[in-house]
Amino acid sequence: MSETMKERKDMDPQYMWDLSTLFKNDEEWNNALPELDEMIKKLPEYQGKLNNAKTIREFFDFDTHLGRKLSDFYCYASLRNCEDTRDSDAQAMEAKAYQVYTAYATAISFAEPEILSLDEDVLESIVHSDDLLPYAFNMQKLLDQKPHVLSAKEEALLAAFTETLGAPSKISESLQDADMTFESVTDSNGEVHELNQSNYILLQMSEDRTLRLNAFKSFYKGFKQHINTFAATYNGCIKEAVAEAQVRHYDSSRAMSMAYEHVPGVVYDSLVDTVRKFMPEMYRYVRLRKQMLGLDELHYYDVYTPLVAGSSKSYTYEEAQQMVLDAVTPLGEDYVNRVKQAYKDRWIDVYPNNGKRGGAFSSGTYDSNPYILTSFTGTLDSVSTIAHEMGHSQHTWLSNHTQTPQNADYTLFVAEVASTVNENLLVEQLLHKTTEPKERLALLNHYLEGFKGTVYRQTMFAEFERDAHAMAERGEAITAASMNILYKNLIKDYFGEDLVIDDEVQYEWARIPHFYRPFYVYKYATSYCAAVALSEAILNNEEGAVKKYLEFLSMGGSAYPLDELKHAGVDFSTPEPVSRALTKFSQILDDVEETLKKL
């Protein structure tokens, strides 16, 4: 029997995050609630008074101060719940934090409509006044939203439903992380393996095809049993987005989602169109994988296993730490020292435990350390995940230490750039040190997986989302059957005829949590393409590349994301960044074919 995961209480504290930069303990967190409640109650005192620059500045300053405290409060509760999603006390904390946030959203809902209801000439003079200089960009973004902001009464009504409208995502998350269990699976030797959310991909990477097949079937059997529930939650998420877009006078839910970041829909469509033009390269990859694995048929449970037998090298966490440090050395001494600080100050929650939230992420607030959740298992993917999340955390640190609170939060469009640059630096650094053909093929395989998983796969997700929301907007039913068909057809399009499409594949859409953040996934693909350009510039020692990149990381949310990327040297007004990235994918395939000749 394979080793089972530990309970949270049995984990070594040195490998658990230290949340004390948020709150020292749960008691201190609880004691923060009365002050938050009192501050929220003061917000309506400004209602009817936001008609001059001085009062608006005072209101913005108060809201910024409150927002920092509220962020700490919510973040701590959320991270505590991630430690063990079965912990009823932590569940209650997050629920309370969400209630407080809902109360805040309701209390402040009058502000934007009130400011935007001012006469045009009065509003113009306020926007350009010296009093509001620290909030100039925020005011510009607010003006951009003017046609879509409702009356104060309507905004208050929507805000009151914040917690309710977030239910589909919470239900899906709870079902997957806390309630769903999977049948244990056997390998080719009859050994039994526990199967859960954290180790599924690890089992799919096994060289034992029997284990891969059994894990694949057991995993998606679990999703099939709940597929109608997942369809209902996803339908709720889509209907919420579509309804809000309609009442806010947007052309579509996608237009609403993209408007805040000032990204035109043509960027989204250009991504899909350009990736589809490079489909032959993905089909080439699938054929190469089939050939290298020596299979008559390539199935979906064969797409994660390493291309080279015996190449599943394992790393300790300490080795992973050093590998990440070596990889980011081109970014300079200050960057390296901050990564060391992250290790020393326990920003990272390292290992899986029973009930721990699946996946990986970086979190934190303006006043706290950044925090990283991961489930390290010793694979190259696990090492890469640390590099990835450290990229997020360093982006957050630089933004928070450069920008004011109101300008520190970078948008989702640029959020994945820093993380992917770190991943690429890691692989390139390892390739540079490796001449042995098998090891080199393992690294090239990892690189290819990055392109497959982040450019092709996320673009496929983007198509799925675009089509699912469009179906709802046309009045078509969002059901398990319709989502299964849509997803299965996209798998066929993106992977081609050389991949056997097993029935279980059609349920995969149900396990993608990012679908509950509408039109987020395409940003993984655009970010990856931007990161390819930036990492190549850094490694090629292009003049000013590191300086411009670190400036980009320090910009936070002080400019629109397309402008920030343009400052760093990436222009998404053309298809060039996507074409350039997929040309790199083709070159890596060439490298694999050449390396194979040396075996």
Go through each PLM region and give its residues:
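Conserved helix-loop functional segments at active or binding sites
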Residues: D326, P330-N337, S363, H392, ...
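Active-site recognition of the HExxH zinc-binding catalytic motif
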Residues: H249, T377-W397, S419, N424, ...
